[in-house]
UniProtKB/Swiss-Prot annotation:
Belongs to the bradykinin-related peptide family. One of its GO terms (biological process) is vasodilation. GO terms for cellular component: extracellular region. It comes from Physalaemus signifer (Girard's dwarf frog). Expressed by the skin glands. Its main location: secreted. One of its GO terms (molecular function) is toxin activity. This is [Ala1,Thr6,Asp11]-phyllokinin. Produces in vitro relaxation of rat arterial smooth muscle and constriction of intestinal smooth muscle. May target bradykinin receptors (BDKRB). It is found in: Secreted. The lineage of its organism: Eukaryota, Metazoa, Chordata, Craniata, Vertebrata.
């Protein structure tokens, strides 16, 4: 996964 990837949505 790329840097800063998150499996959760962040608005």
């Amino acid at each position: 996964a790329p840097p800063g990837f998150t499996p959760f949505r962040i608005d």
